[in-house]
Amino acid sequence: MEEPQSDPSIEPPLSQETFSDLWKLLPENNVLSPLPSQAVDDLMLSPDDLAQWLTEDPGPDEAPRMSEAAPPMAPTPAAPTPAAPAPAPSWPLSSSVPSQKTYHGSYGFRLGFLHSGTAKSVTCTYSPDLNKMFCQLAKTCPVQLWVDSTPPPGSRVRAMAIYKQSQHMTEVVRRCPHHERCSDSDGLAPPQHLIRVEGNLRVEYSDDRNTFRHSVVVPYEPPEVGSDCTTIHYNYMCNSSCMGGMNRRPILTIITLEDSSGNLLGRNSFEVRVCACPGRDRRTEEENFRKKGEPCHQLPPGSTKRALPNNTSSSPQPKKKPLDGEYFTLQIRGRERFEMFRELNEALELKDAQAGKEPAGSRAHSSHLKSKKGQSTSRHKKFMFKTEGPDSD
C-alpha cells in the first residue's frame, strides 16, 4: 500500500520549523561576536568627554532633567585598618623616690611598737634588732606616734610604701591583681592601695598625679588623757609573696608628719613583711641576723691579706680542774655491787694517773689498789692448757 504524499502547499506547524529559518531570525550583531558591537561603543564615554561633561554647567533645560535623575551612589568607604594591639600593661614608674632617712624634726617625731613575742598565734610582731614588722594579711598593725611637743593644728600623718632595694625603688607598690578583685573594700579605700587605716572615718587615700604613688593620710590627734602617744591601726592588704604584686621584694613603710600645707615636720620608716606566720619568720630572720653579726677580725688599713687570729694553736687547751684530795667511805650491801663499784673506782683512778692529774699523795693508794686488783683477778682466773694430740711433736 503506498503512503500518501504530503502536499507542498501545506506549511508545517511552528514546532517543525527548520534551523535555517531560526538562524535568519537572529540579529546581525549578536552577542556571540568576538568584537564589541557599534552600539556598545556609542554608549561608552572617553575620559575627556567625561571630564568635560562634569565641568560644564547644565543648561536651563537640562537642570530639571538632572534633578529628576537618581542621586549618584555614595563612594564605598574604605575598610578600616586594623588597630595595633595595645601594649601589655606595665607597672607605673615614679618620677621620684621618697626619702627614708629618719628625721625627728623640731617636734621630736618618732615611732613606737607594742612588745610581742614570736609565738605562732601572733598576728603582728615587731623586731627591734631588724627594725622590721611582721604581720598577717589584713590584720591590725598598731603603730605608736611619739612627739616631744604638740604639732601645729591641722597636722597630718601620711603612710607610704616603697620598695627597699634600689633596683625596684622607682616602681609603685600596689596590690596584686588577685587581691585587687577581692570584695574586701570598706568603701573608702581604692582596691589597688596596699596600706589602709582601720577605724578612722577621716582617712584620705591619695594618688599623686606626678609620682603615681599611693599614700594614706589621717589627721594628727593628740594623745588622750593619761596616754603619752597616739596609736594608728594600719592594715596591709596583700602578701609579700604574691605574684604580680610585691613578688617577695622587701618594702619599707615611711611615716611622715606634715603640717596643713604639706611641709615635712618629721619622718621615720620601718621594714614590713606580710606573711602567714609572723612569729616564725621573725624568729628565723633574727637568728640569721645574729649569725651574720658575729664579730670578725678587722683588716689593718692598707692590708690585702687576711688577718690571722691571735691564738695560733690548732686546738684549744683543756682547762685544768682542781682535784679534791678528800677520801670518803661508802658502805655497799652485796658482794657483786661492791666488786662493780670497786672496779669503777679503780678505772677512774687509773685514768687520772695516766693523765697526770692525780696528786702525789694518792699515787701510793692507787698502787695498793692495783696490787689488790691483781690478787682478786688471779682468784677467778682459769688457766688454759694446750691439749696434746697424737700428731704433736
Swiss-Prot record:
The modification Omega-N-methylarginine is found at residue 333. Residues 359-363 are annotated as: Interaction with USP7. The keyword Ubl conjugation applies. The modification N6-acetyllysine is found at residues 120, 305, 321, 373, 381-382. It is found in: Cytoplasm; Nucleus; Nucleus, PML body; Endoplasmic reticulum. It comes from Macaca fascicularis (Crab-eating macaque). This is Cellular tumor antigen p53. A motif (Bipartite nuclear localization signal) lies at residues 305-321. Residues 1-320 are annotated as: Interaction with CCAR2. One of its GO terms (biological process) is DNA damage response. Residues 283-295 have a biased composition (Basic and acidic residues). The record marks 120 as: Interaction with DNA. The modification Phosphothreonine is found at residues 18, 55, 284. It is linked to p53 is found in increased amounts in a wide variety of transformed cells. p53 is frequently mutated or inactivated in many types of cancer. There is a cross-link at residues 24, 291-292, 351, 357 (Glycyl lysine isopeptide (Lys-Gly) (interchain with G-Cter in ubiquitin)).
